[in-house]
């Protein structure tokens, strides 16, 4: 199989095998893994290159998503699976966990605090929201124990609004 590339718009590079489009990557990735046009590449080497491209795309998407707001590990993985294969999504989540950019414990504490203090939600509702986002039950229990909402006072506050 003969590998060639074409520059796309912006920072995109299109990779072709035997003059047929296969996949798009970034100029940064291509600069790091450059192969001259016309290089003969084996099926195994091609599959490794495609996997590296997919892993980089998943990692970039994870960084982009986490730059907007916090996510639970499950929530981030689910979003990555919309555009990435499971292996690439899992690797990106693991890298974000290792780097400390993803922490379900901290996320649960912030989410519970926001829901109870700012939104005036009950502990039950906060638990449901955390479970919906894929946070482990034990982590939710600890976050709720730290917050200890007063549901009676919350109900009074809502009635008096």
Predicted feature locations:
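An alpha-helical, amphipathic repeat domain used for nucleic-acid recognition
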Residues: 1-161
């Amino acid at each position: 199989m003969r590998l060639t590339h074409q520059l796309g718009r912006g920072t995109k590079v299109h990779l072709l095998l035997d003059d047929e489009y296969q996949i798009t990557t970034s100029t940064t990735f291509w600069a790091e893994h450059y192969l001259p046009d016309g290089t003969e590449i084996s099926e195994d080497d091609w599959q490794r290159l495609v996997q590296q491209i997919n892993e980089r795309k998943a990692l970039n998407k994870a960084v982009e998503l986490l730059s907007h707001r916090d996510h639970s590990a499950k929530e981030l993985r689910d979003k990555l699976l919309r555009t990435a294969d499971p292996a690439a999504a899992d690797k990106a989540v693991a890298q974000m966990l290792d780097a400390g950019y993803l922490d379900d414990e901290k996320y649960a504490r912030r989410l519970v605090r926001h829901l109870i203090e700012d939104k005036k939600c009950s502990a039950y509702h906060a638990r449901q929201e955390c479970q919906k986002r894929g946070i482990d039950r034990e982590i939710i229990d600890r976050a709720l124990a730290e917050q200890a909402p007063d549901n009676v006072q919350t109900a009074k506050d809502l009635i008096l609004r």
